[in-house]
Amino acid sequence: MNMRLLLLLLFGSVVMYTSCQSTSALIDSLAARVTENTSKGQILFRLVTDEADPAKDYFEIDSKDGKVLITGNSDLSLATGLNWYLKYVAGIHLSWNNPSQKLPEVLPLPQKKIRQATAMKNRYYLNYCTYSYSMAFWDWERWEKEIDWMAMHGINMPLSITGMEVVWYNLLKRIGYTTEEINEFISGPAFMAWWQMNNLEGWGGPNPDSWYRQQEALQKKIIARMRELGIEPVFPGYAGMVPRNIGEKLGYQIADPGKWCGFPRPAFLSTEDEHFDSFAAMYYEELEKLYGKAKYYSMDPFHEGGNTEGVDLAKAGTSIMGAMKKANPEAVWVMQAWQANPREAMVNTLDSSDLLVLDLYSEKLPQWGDPESMWYREKGFGKHDWLYCMLLNFGGNVGLHGRMEQLVNGYYNACAHVNGKTLRGVGATPEGIENNPVMFELLYELPWREERFSPDEWLQTYLKARYGNDLSPEVAEAWRALEHTVYNAPKNYQGEGTVESLLCARPGFHLDRTSTWGYAKLF
């Protein structure tokens, strides 16, 4: 054999072996955490590529020498396969209510090889609001559990806004703002979501210096673990937000987006202003110094009714995109489809490969082109890629709620629709989490199930995962009742999330709701 060819083969073998070993160690560690150190020697992981169909992610569950063998094309696929095995072979359901569980001494083996694959390469997670309603004061111990949960559900692009206040702190210091002025702009921890969405400024602050140091260190640990697992964090990009006083203080040309729920919004830096490009560049520089470059940047200019008077939307769109591309030419702009966004005038001139739209409320008010939707857009999102997303939760309110049939049927209808040619995956965009885990299991299995299925049939398999293989008839009957009531909200139900408790309403003699937009009557 040619010596050069022999050396090349040997080198390739070493590289492949090292890659498999490092990946195995990484997923072994995850498996140990979620099984309370009982998976070692019982579950084996193997990373391989599928040369026959490289466009798809996949995993296989099999057995070898009396042990469970999980094969996949990436770390995330292996983690997703682990979760699938635990649910559908071992009868173990890991969720927010039960994030880890010891394995039995003798693990059940699959009766035959299980293989699941998906061409839906994007699986998104989180909403800005989640960071305030559910995550405002999480520490690393809690975040580690959540990242494990993400990996086991195949999530590969979660919104990541922890510690972004440090970016703004450093940026504003750089242009001459005092610490006091900065804290008048940056909101307190419980209101970071609405500050990041350009809805308000300063509310709930000021923040102590220790907060900024703590959140910077926490975010660095979060994104390091995500990137180890092949998860791409979605960072907030620069969409024109500036403090309201920047015109008076520094002479910047700004537009006033008005108020949001009575709160004065931060100003919008005009793209006509000579400072726009330099300010955006400084933002991305400070972001990269702290947390590195991102593949995805989330930006939602004029969120929830922001005033666009005097704004050239087309120029704003190209300027925002241009600033992002200067920071990372390979980056993609992620935008929420919510109410008037995305505005056609802002995105029509953008290249199709540069924007990814989140159809934020696909299970109720889809904008992808469903003619039955109140938010119907005939052309959907046009040439741009998009994700089918489940919103589910509003306000972090806790209660049993879901739209199983609409979620499943809507997804497969979208896949079959002409606008489905640009559908690239799914996402969960809840305002609050740690409730209704059944809906998240259902959502994140959709891309791994190529054929349309019945929610009723799926629920029977889910219940065995949740309660074990010895499912009692009483439990099954109770869940059938839930499936056809609270987990099958009718299309004409206009409430935001779960029905409300009248105990939370203002006193009155004829109450039927707590909020003006909600309902207390169960369907």
Task: Show which residues each predicted segment covers.
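Catalytic-core regions of glycoside hydrolase
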Residues: 93, 97-107, 126-130, 151, ...
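Bacterial Sec-dependent N-terminal signal peptides
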Residues: 1-25
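Second-shell loop/turn segments in exported
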Residues: 67-72, 131-137, 209-210
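Active-site-adjacent substrate/metal-binding segments within catalytic domains
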Residues: 120-139, 150
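Stable alpha-helical elements in mature extracytoplasmic
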Residues: 23-30, 78, 82, 142-146, ...
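Contiguous, structured surface segment used for ligand recognition
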Residues: 20-120
